């Protein structure tokens, strides 16, 4: 849908850049753009009262250190107490577990994150360097006039305009959808996750990865002490409904020795002082914006999941949020310098990233040969080979 005709208001505030979405990508971009530009962050939710759905995406590779330093975030990041990433053990290409040592990575092992603390720290840094945050905005009225994007929130009763508009709204891609940009969804992958309370005997810090007949698992102990367990399956899988219950999800996970040894046992779980935590479901499949159409819209950019959303098996979501914020900051500099086609290099980089990602994703999903005949695996192998 094209931008609506903008009604004139006398209380419209002028900015250089408006970022819709105060998640990792939007907040990182705000850090990078200040103090050169006047930056407004608009967030649909009220962050102080946001729904208590634990975020998924708990790791950063060592290569992220360069970006964190560039954004002025690294010292604060280290002080936040994220845990160094240790080994990964996987039952993937074969049922027998195989160990992978992160110390082989020349960029360093990376980190397991306290995701909530990481996001809060990014936003706090953006505000410290002078970005302005307005939260609880709800649906935004969107228009464009005289080369300016114009937005207004009915909840806040305030108008804003800027020559640059950023969609950092995550997988919803709310601003891109309003502008009629197509989004290609590769598959209907769903992530079911549960955050388990601390268990005294669980001191394991490894990332555990298991292929299953109709999907795949991962589990890791977070810096806060809780353990996340996640299962990824098709959205139309008949087992999906039953696995939304913690008892069923845990029972299925315990069928894998690699997971069973770090999960709580049955005795007393969900009884009295040990309540069963909820299971959360969220879309997790690959998706990409129409990058050619994106380049054709002056002053409009997409970052993070709003541009490209990665399958969690790639462990690239948070790194991509930071990397796309850096690339977009450079494009915005080119725009304000008056250069033609400021987005061209950024779009080309996104397209290259997505091409490499799909190639690696195909190789990853081709690993569990023992499951190739099952619909979950056969569907992905066929789609990624095309």
Regions found by a protein language model. Name each.
Residues 125-268:
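Predominantly flavin-linked oxidoreductase catalytic cores and closely associated redox partners
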Residues 103-124, 174, 239-244:
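Short beta-strand to alpha-helix junction loop
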Residues 237-329, 336, 340-344:
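FAD/FMN-dependent oxidoreductases across multiple families
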Residues 9-23, 40:
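Beta1/beta-strand and adjacent pyrophosphate-binding region of the FAD-binding site
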Residues 330-386:
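C-terminal helical "tail/cap" subdomain of flavin- and related membrane-associated enzymes
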Residues 31-56:
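Glycine-rich FAD pyrophosphate-binding loop
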Residues 51-91:
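N-terminal FAD cofactor-binding segment of flavoenzymes
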Residues 26-27:
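N-terminal Rossmann-fold NAD(P) dinucleotide-binding loop
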């Amino acid at each position: 849908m094209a931008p609506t005709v903008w009604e004139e208001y006398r209380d419209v505030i002028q900015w250089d850049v408006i970022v819709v979405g105060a998640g990792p990508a939007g907040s990182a971009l705000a850090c990078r753009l200040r103090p050169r530009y006047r930056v407004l962050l608009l967030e649909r939710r009220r962050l102080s009262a946001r729904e208590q759905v634990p975020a998924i995406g708990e790791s950063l590779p060592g290569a992220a250190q360069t970006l964190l330093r560039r954004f002025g975030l690294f010292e604060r990041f280290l002080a936040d107490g994220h845990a160094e990433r240790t080994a990964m053990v996987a039952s993937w290409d074969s049922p027998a577990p195989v160990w992978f040592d992160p110390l082989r990575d020349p960029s360093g092992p990376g980190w397991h994150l306290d995701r909530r603390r990481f996001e809060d720290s990014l936003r706090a840094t953006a505000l410290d360097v002078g970005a302005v945050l307005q939260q609880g905005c709800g649906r935004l009225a969107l228009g464009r006039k005289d080369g300016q994007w114009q937005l207004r929130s009915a909840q806040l009763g305030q108008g804003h305009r800027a020559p640059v508009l950023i969609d950092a709204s995550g997988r919803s891609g709310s601003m891109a959808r309003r502008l009629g940009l197509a989004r290609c969804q590769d598959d209907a992958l769903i992530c079911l996750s549960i955050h388990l309370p601390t268990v005294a005997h669980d001191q394991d810090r490894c990332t555990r990865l298991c292929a299953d007949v109709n999907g795949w698992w991962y589990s890791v102990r977070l810096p806060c002490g809780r353990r996340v367990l996640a299962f990824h399956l098709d959205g139309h899988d008949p087992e999906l409904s039953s696995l939304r219950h913690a008892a069923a999800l845990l029972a299925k996970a315990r069928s894998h020795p690699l997971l069973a040894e770090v999960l709580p046992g049955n005795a007393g779980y969900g009884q009295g002082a040990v309540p069963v935590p909820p299971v959360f479901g969220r879309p997790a499949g690959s998706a990409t914006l129409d990058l050619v159409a994106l380049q054709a819209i002056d002053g409009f950019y997409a970052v993070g999941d709003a541009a490209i959303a990665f399958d969690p098996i790639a462990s690239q979501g948070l790194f991509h949020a930071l990397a796309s914020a850096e690339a977009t900051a450079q494009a915005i500099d080119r725009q304000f310098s008056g250069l033609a086609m400021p987005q061209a290099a950024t779009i080309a980089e996104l397209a290259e990233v997505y091409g490499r990602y799909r190639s690696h994703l195909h190789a990853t999903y081709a690993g569990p040969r023992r499951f190739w005949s099952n619909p979950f695996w056969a569907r992905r192998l066929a789609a990624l080979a095309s």
